[in-house]
Amino acid sequence: MDSLLSICDIKEEVSYIIDLAIKIKAGEVEDKPLEGKTLAMIFQKSSTRTRVSFDVGMYQLGGRGIFLSSSDLQMGRGEPISDTAKVLSRFVDGIMIRAIEHQDVVELAKYSDVPVISGLTNLEHPCQALADMLTVKEHFGSFENKKICFVGDGNNVCNSLLLIAPLLGMDMSVACPKGYEPCEDILKIANEYANENNTEITVSDNINVALDNVDIVYTDVWVSMGDEAEKAQREKDLSHYQVNQKLMDIANDGAIFMHCLPAVRGQEVSAEVIDGSQSVVYDQAENRLHAQKAILYHYLK
């Protein structure tokens, strides 16, 4: 069964899904294509954008979503993931899961007879990356000759961006302190994609080097859910990696600022930047809806 657990799963369909999202957003797709379809939405972690966008997306496509927290499921009381997958497959047409551990999503998909869509794990955030690239295409018109720089902790969002950027012909750099580099396995695959598409991936602890010739500056929170015990150390280690106007001025003229939200103003980004004219963060947030509608259409229709 085809599922979306990683950008790697849609290596050949990335451009198609983004273009489909543009058509759906413009109202150029048939009305209510998922009428009668049901999506189970499992949340092991709290969410604003993921929950609302998937719920609204299913409704607008003619289907419905069922919200399931860990406390709603026997899985939260020890039922094997395999049993949960097999049973839910008898009731619904697809499963979206926002999980703590990536392996839980892999196992769910292994035993599911319906498509499984990752709404975030500790390793990747493919839906966010698709929404981000939809935003980039809307803003610049194409991905040609564009470069994105991720500043800060090389986390799950960074991992998905590293995979999707070269597939669309974009260069990508990561600026992070030592010890906060992206996943090595992800970097290996990203470099393979870059070689196939004549693009470049770089990782550096030097922000000035990473921001050279950059059109998109992207950051995320320093302390993600689950990292609270490391809060003080993370804030210390990442203190020189705040995206402020001085950093934005290093990027190319016309560069945009991106953030997947929620944001902590005064930490990973200054209020001046996130609330300024170069920021497209609310376009990104809205595009979660349109990108995920394209994903739902692709997997459930």
Positions of PLM-derived features:
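Short, structured coil segments at secondary-structure junctions
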Residues: 61, 91, 111-112, 168, ...
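Anion-binding alpha/beta catalytic cores of soluble intermediary-metabolism enzymes, centered on
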Residues: 93-164, 259
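Glycine-rich phosphate/diphosphate-binding loop of Rossmann-like nucleotide-binding domains
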Residues: 44-57, 140-219
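Positively charged, low-complexity intrinsically disordered leader regions
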Residues: 1-52, 56, 124
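Adenosine-phosphate binding glycine-rich loop
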Residues: 254-255, 261-301
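Rossmann-like adenosine-cofactor binding region
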Residues: 192-272
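Active-site cofactor/substrate anionic-group-binding motifs, chiefly glycine-
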Residues: 38-39, 43-91
